[in-house]
């Protein structure tokens, strides 16, 4: 188990019990150095080209839905400093970034992205925080942080935040490749593709698939309303 501790328990417990203040404080502490870390190819955040691969796949998915995306908005769930939203915003009518960390949101707002808003909030409340969107994106293995029970709640929230024919793309840690990568934290939840697809169906998505080769540390879920 990771050495990360809190006065209210281990890191895994903090997420599983949805201790949102403790989670926010954890990410607040990383906000000022987050983009610098992502710019370092040796950083664990870039293990297996996670960020670059996510954005490339999302751009291809958007290109196949160009007209649909152009008349709808996009929600970045767990947006951090707004890097993903900055990559895709031009393809959508509007964008919203939601993150639990006030300091992350402060950095995101400083980008002054046109037609975008950044709000402090948690991803369990997407339908009440945002207008319904054509796409919900989430990069940062959000479900692997929160675990199965809370992850299911996030999927339900994402489904409720979408317009008909809208789509969700999020990444998750791949159980099948867990032993093949140097950075394999024990305090995260690793999912099989079959499991994550079943969770998406329970959340009400009509079409679900996973994207990525079986040896990838993180796979992507594509779920369509």
What is each residue range found by the language model?
Residues 137:
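A conserved beta-strand element that flanks and buttresses the S-adenosyl-L-methionine
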């Amino acid at each position: 188990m990771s050495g990360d501790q809190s006065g209210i328990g281990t890191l895994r417990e903090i997420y599983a019990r949805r201790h949102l203040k403790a989670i926010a404080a954890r990410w607040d502490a990383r906000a000022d150095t987050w983009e610098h870390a992502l710019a370092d190819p040796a950083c664990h955040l870039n293990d297996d080209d996670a960020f670059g691969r996510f954005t490339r796949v999302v751009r291809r998915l958007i290109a196949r839905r160009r007209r649909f995306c152009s008349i709808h908005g996009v929600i970045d769930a767990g947006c951090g400093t707004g890097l993903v939203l900055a990559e895709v915003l031009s393809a959508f009518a509007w964008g919203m970034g939601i993150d639990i960390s006030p300091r992350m949101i402060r950095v995101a707002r400083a980008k002054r992205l046109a037609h975008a808003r950044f709000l402090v909030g948690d991803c369990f409340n997407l339908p009440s925080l945002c207008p319904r969107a054509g796409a919900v994106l989430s990069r940062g293995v959000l479900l692997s942080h929160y675990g199965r029970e809370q992850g299911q709640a996030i999927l339900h929230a994402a489904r409720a935040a979408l317009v008909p024919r809208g789509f969700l793309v999020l990444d998750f840690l791949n159980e099948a490749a867990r032993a093949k990568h140097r950075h394999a934290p024990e305090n995260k939840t690793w999912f099989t593709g079959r499991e994550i697809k079943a969770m998406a169906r329970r959340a009400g998505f009509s079409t679900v698939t996973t994207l990525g080769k079986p040896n990838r540390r993180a796979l992507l879920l594509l779920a369509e309303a």
